[in-house]
């Protein structure tokens, strides 16, 4: 009987340790293959090198981070395992790229956004479908979903073949301001992460989505040298604050005026 109790306690300890260590994987667990139909992968068309993630918001439009731009981009839609190409995957080249033009009341962090018009639209399929733009702003305290092919260890980085997904929390901007004093006193960006550390977006996740309560609210910005540190949440471009610009460009008004 004593031996059984000892073995049972050892099993509990082992399971507890396994749970804690799995929580420390940057980016969480492997995404379900049907969970990220809107997630796209941006590659350098010349070298084939993976650059960033992005989000399909319309059959003809992708939203990503401005710092992901390079001269020649190829976009993979419906991708899951980057080492294996499947018949259902599609590729597109940009027809045109749009960058947020406003300077007044917008810092460089606020403007890390790029809208890409695809050379030709894609059709919805089992593995490809756009996500809607947000209908309301995100609320502090929301649980948000992150996903991407970024590093799953840091600072010694390893990159997965398949995207990883995880849940994080949305904080008040002051939390990121305290973590990164170089940030401006006020900003239109979002602040999200896990205060205890261990789960975070990392290098390679840039441009990918932040999904809060089922709505596409943020775009991953470039992070620091080390990811998933305690009390070091990440900064995301606020999609809702750019809705008028995004919708105007998609509607064909490329000479949009800056919001106040």
Swiss-Prot record:
One BP annotation, GO: proteolysis
Protein name: Snake venom serine protease serpentokallikrein-1
GO MF terms held by the record: serine-type endopeptidase activity; toxin activity
Subunit structure: Monomer.
Chief site of localization: secreted
EC number: 3.4.21.-
UniProt cross-references to InterPro entries, sorted A to Z: Peptidase_S1_PA, Peptidase_S1_PA_chymotrypsin, Peptidase_S1A, Trypsin_dom, TRYPSIN_HIS, TRYPSIN_SER
Disulphide-bonded residues: 31-165, 52-68, 102-258, 144-212, 176-191, 202-227
Lineage of producing organism: Eukaryota, Metazoa, Chordata, Craniata, Vertebrata
């Amino acid at each position: 009987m004593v031996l059984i109790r000892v073995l049972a306690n050892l099993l509990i300890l082992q399971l507890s340790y396994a749970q804690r260590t799995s929580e420390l994987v940057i980016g969480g667990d492997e995404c379900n293959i049907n969970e990220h139909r809107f997630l796209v992968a941006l590659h350098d068309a010349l070298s084939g090198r993976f650059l960033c993630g992005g989000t399909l918001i319309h059959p003809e439009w992708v939203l990503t981070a401005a710092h992901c731009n390079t001269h020649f981009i190829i976009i993979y839609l419906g991708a899951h395992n980057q080492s294996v190409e499947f018949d259902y995957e599609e590729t597109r080249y940009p027809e045109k790229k749009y960058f947020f033009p406003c300077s007044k009341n917008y810092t460089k962090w606020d403007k890390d956004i790029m809208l890409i018009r695809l050379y030709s639209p894609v059709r919805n399929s089992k593995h490809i479908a756009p996500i809607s733009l947000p209908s309301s702003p995100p609320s502090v305290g929301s649980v948000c979903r992150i996903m991407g092919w970024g590093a799953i260890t840091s600072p010694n980085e390893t990159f997965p073949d398949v995207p990883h997904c995880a849940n994080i929390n949305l904080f008040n901007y002051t939390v990121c301001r305290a973590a990164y004093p170089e940030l401006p006193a006020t900003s239109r960006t979002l602040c999200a992460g896990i205060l205890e550390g261990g789960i975070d977006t990392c290098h390679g996740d840039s441009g990918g989505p932040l999904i809060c309560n089922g709505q596409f609210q943020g775009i991953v910005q470039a992070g620091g040298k080390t990811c998933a540190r305690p009390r070091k949440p990440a900064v995301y471009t606020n999609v809702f604050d750019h809705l008028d610009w995004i919708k105007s460009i998609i509607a064909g008004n490329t000479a949009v005026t800056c919001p106040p």
